[in-house]
């Protein structure tokens, strides 16, 4: 009797895509959650410059391109059998590979992301597509121009995979974790007890600052740490203020002091 085996390469390619829609769908199922929103529902509907149907189509296009490149990358770097013979699982090895991958992808994305803001042509024709979402929401996290998706996410992910030396099996967990983190950073909510808000300075409020007009030259770091913003002077501190009609609002510290 023939058995059907799903390879780690297949799972490493498609599990993060499934995780993206499941995790962002969870936020949709939670409802409006007005008292935890960083922007009102009215602002979300009125300020964003792209329809939600266009966002879904854009994300699906990017994920299709990522899947194709992931399959090619896994084919080039070897099979499950090769990985199994060269790596023995240990928590220490897993932690080391995760940390290296996080640092690599953060470094790559910071400098590419910042350059897309500095270069007027790239911003106008490519990166501005992501900034059509002035009020971010969960499933808009990967709404980008296809070329930006290739440069920022796909190549960044490939480099983190290669430099960390992780196996396809480890990649399943790392890229699923990175996907959850990215979706959470764009969820537009400040939920009590959210572990990403507790353990990471780079979170939904931090990234929300970057999506506002006053913050487009700051807070480029994504998706894990804020080190490059701090080192290179693009870190914009902010305060989280309660709105009178419910929810929260991010305000740059400089503006808060002047008021």
From Swiss-Prot:
Pathway: Membrane lipid metabolism; sphingolipid biosynthesis
EC number(s) stated in the UniProt entry for this protein: 1.14.18.5
BP term (GO), one: sphingoid biosynthetic process
Catalytic reactions of this protein: a dihydroceramide + 2 Fe(II)-[cytochrome b5] + O2 + 2 H(+) = a phytoceramide + 2 Fe(III)-[cytochrome b5] + H2O
Cofactor names: Fe cation
Locus of motif Histidine box-3: 206-212
Pfam families given in the database record: FA_hydroxylase
Consequences of knocking out this gene: No visible phenotype; due to the redundancy with SBH1. Sbh1 and sbh2 double mutants are severely dwarfed, do not progress from vegetative to reproductive growth and have enhanced expression of programmed cell death associated-genes.
Positions occupied by motif Histidine box-2: 127-131
Known tissue expression: Ubiquitous, with higher levels in flowers and roots.
Residue numbers covered by motif Histidine box-1: 113-117
Keywords: Endoplasmic reticulum, Lipid biosynthesis, Lipid metabolism, Membrane, Oxidoreductase, Transmembrane, Transmembrane helix
Domain Fatty acid hydroxylase: from-to ranges: 98-234
UniProt membrane topology term: Multi-pass membrane protein
Transmembrane segments annotated in the record for this chain: 10-30, 54-74, 91-111
Cellular localisation: Endoplasmic reticulum membrane
GO cellular component, one term: endoplasmic reticulum
Main localization category: endoplasmic reticulum
Record GO terms (molecular function): iron ion binding; sphingolipid C4-monooxygenase activity
Protein task: Involved in sphingolipid trihydroxy long-chain base (4-hydroxysphinganine) biosynthesis. Can use C18- and C20-sphinganine as substrates to produce C18- and C20-phytosphinganines (D-ribo-2-amino-1,3,4-trihydroxyoctadecane and -eicosane).
PANTHER family cross-referenced by the UniProt entry: STEROL DESATURASE
Entry's free-text remark on domains: The histidine box domains may contain the active site and/or be involved in metal ion binding.
Family: Belongs to the sterol desaturase family.
Protein known as: Sphinganine C4-monooxygenase 2
């Amino acid at each position: 009797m023939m058995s059907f085996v799903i390879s780690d390469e297949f799972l490493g390619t498609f599990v993060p895509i499934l995780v993206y829609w499941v995790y962002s769908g969870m936020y949709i199922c939670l409802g409006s959650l007005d008292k935890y929103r960083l922007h009102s529902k009215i602002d979300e509907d009125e300020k964003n410059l792209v329809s939600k149907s266009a966002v879904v189509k854009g994300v699906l296009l990017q994920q299709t391109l990522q899947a194709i490149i992931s399959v090619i990358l896994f084919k080039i770097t070897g099979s499950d059998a090769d990985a199994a013979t060269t790596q023995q699982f240990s928590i220490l090895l897993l932690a080391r590979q995760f940390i290296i991958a996080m640092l690599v992808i953060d470094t790559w994305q910071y400098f590419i992301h910042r350059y897309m803001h500095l270069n007027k042509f790239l911003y106008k024709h490519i990166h501005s597509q992501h900034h059509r979402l002035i009020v971010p929401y969960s499933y808009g996290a990967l709404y980008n121009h296809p070329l930006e998706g290739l440069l920022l996410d796909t190549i960044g992910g490939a480099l983190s995979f290669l430099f960390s030396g992780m196996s396809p099996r480890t990649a399943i967990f790392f890229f699923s974790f990175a996907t959850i983190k990215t979706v959470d950073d764009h969820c537009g909510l400040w939920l009590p007890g959210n572990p990403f808000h507790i353990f990471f300075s780079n979170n939904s409020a931090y990234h929300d600052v970057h999506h506002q007009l006053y913050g487009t030259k700051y807070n480029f770091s994504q998706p894990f740490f804020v080190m490059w913003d701090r080192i290179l002077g693009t870190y914009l501190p902010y305060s989280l203020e309660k709105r009178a009609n419910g929810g929260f609002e991010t305000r740059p510290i400089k503006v808060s002091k002047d008021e």
